[in-house]
Amino acid sequence: MMQLSRGQRRWLAAIAVLLIGGFFIARHLMAPVPVNYQTVKVVHRDLQQNVLATGKLDAVRKVDVGAQVSGQLEKLYVEIGDHVKRGQLLAMIDPQQAQNQIKEVEATLQDLNAQRIQAKAELHLATVTLGRQQNLAKLQVVSRQDLDQAVTDLAVKNAKVGTIDAQINKAKASLDTAKINLDYTQISAPMDGDVVQITTLQGQTVIAAQQAPNILTLADMSTMLVQAQVSEADVINLKPGMKASFTVLGDPGKRFSGVLKDILPTPEKVNDAIFYSARFEVPNPDRLLRLQMTAQVSIQLANVDQAVVIPLAALGDELGSNRYQVTVLKEGKEEKREVTIGIRNNVDAQVISGLSVGEDVIVSRGGTGDA
């Protein structure tokens, strides 16, 4: 028998090791790779479909309080943040000009009353004179010219009284206006509210020639108005009466609720995107909400109590209108199902048919080496 050298034996041993290693590697590669399934159970729970938006808070009632007469703002009785009651004195404009106007009109009225007394006396005299002339005319002891003169004089005196009466009425109206202007120098609160802005400072002069200059702004903070900016894709699904709620950044755990009031028809363009203002009111008895706060708004489109629910991640290929393919893991094996879904939100979908509560639906799959 031929003896192998030491080198040949080493080569044969190396080849044997390679053959054995290759066999095990090939066996490993040909073996089926175990699949790890991530599944979620089909459950019963309440499901809502919402439109999400960002909005701003404003007061339902906000009034600019202005001056209706010109003059210097002599006194300002409030500061920003003060709560005022309806009728409370807020500011006063220098009343001297209005007071002088009243004095002038009263003097004019007094003079007109004196003129009227004189005119009435002259009218009485003219009436008596005409009567006397008419009696004399019957006796034919007065000329026709004198009689006509007496008639004319009576008419003139009567017209003079009428003119003075008209002037008196005009002066009375001017006096009423002057008194109203004096009242206007006292600026009072038209409603209960908080002073949220002061536009004119004490000592400044206001001119009310064309429009009432603004002195300050009052806001009724007991009820707030939420204006949510809703995209044009979502606004077609909204209608007044829908439930709406929101949270604010300062207290994200507290939710404020209301009912959608209206949707403004005029859009707002922001970076080439179109948004519409959906508005609703919320009570603010504790004054927690403030002007221009940012609101994270949710408007409820639909709600199903105790719906059959699966995550959106479980939905496979779309098979038709609201019909999808879903894979169920049953006894370790995949089973394809066709399901019909109802409402959905950004996370879950309602199952109308095709699945039962408790079944496991596959949301992802991967091999043993997958992270």
Swiss-Prot record:
One of its GO terms (biological process) is response to antibiotic. It is a single-pass membrane protein. Gene3D superfamilies: 2.40.30.170, 2.40.420.20, 2.40.50.100, 6.10.140.1990. The keyword Cell membrane applies. Its main location: membrane. The chain crosses the membrane at residues 11-31. GO terms for molecular function: efflux transmembrane transporter activity. It is found in: Cell inner membrane. Residues 94-127 form a coiled coil. Part of the tripartite efflux system MacAB-TolC. MacA stimulates the ATPase activity of MacB by promoting the closed ATP-bound state of MacB, increases the capacity of MacB to bind macrolides such as erythromycin, and provides a physical link between MacB and TolC. Confers resistance against macrolides. Belongs to the membrane fusion protein (MFP) (TC 8.A.1) family. Homohexamer. Part of the tripartite efflux system MacAB-TolC, which is composed of an inner membrane transporter, MacB, a periplasmic membrane fusion protein, MacA, and an outer membrane component, TolC. The complex forms a large protein conduit and can translocate molecules across both the inner and outer membranes. MacA interacts with MacB and TolC. This is Macrolide export protein MacA.
